[in-house]
Amino acid sequence: ISIRKSGKETQIQTDENTIVFVPEHVTMTVNKGADKLAELSVNNTTLDINSLKFDSEIALKTNADYTWAVHVDISPSEAVASASMEIASANIVSVVAGLQLDASKVNPQMTEDDLIASILSATTTSVVNSQLMVAGTAPKIQEMIYALNNINASTDKEYAIAEAAVYNQYMDVNMQYTGDGVPFASVEAQPYLEYEYSYGDTHYEYYEVEPVIVFASDNSRYSFEEYFNEADFGNVLQ
């Protein structure tokens, strides 16, 4: 394994005794003998603590012709991350996620939950490949976080039901064929029984929340695992 750095370095003082140097370019190469197995590169990294701006491009290439690329751009008002996966230069899937921010509301005395709820105002996400697109928005992140933090439930099942209801109230996610623009299904949250057991005379049940695909044509419901299986949707997986 070899690591190289180049370009301008940004100094960040994390505390009175520690200074971190962030290089503009970093490349890590993994070799086995004379063969290059993989190369990870971080390029065009810019960081400005005073203006709260960050930008960087990350790429991972393997000798099997797989490439993963990520671009992150953060400012006081917006954070955007895009990612893509390619095989032999053919795009397999692309992801774009955006957050609307208000960095002026940052207060060092805030708890982590209050900090997140205060600076985030909305989010958008899209996942696209050559055939399918999943797009989602959550325009009231602050209200959603507060609603999740204030769930009052006496059992695990009641909590999961309430949690799913909050997600469904504040998030809008749909599926459509790439280039079509017409949603054929929505994505909703639903509670499910993860596992259960009995100990003596007491029975225990533990619930979680999962996304499910709800088709507009017949209101049928499928988990992501059920729908995106190799037998029924192999061409998308390929």
Where do the protein language model's features map onto the residues?
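N-terminal "mature head" segments of proteins
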Residues: 1-19, 185-238
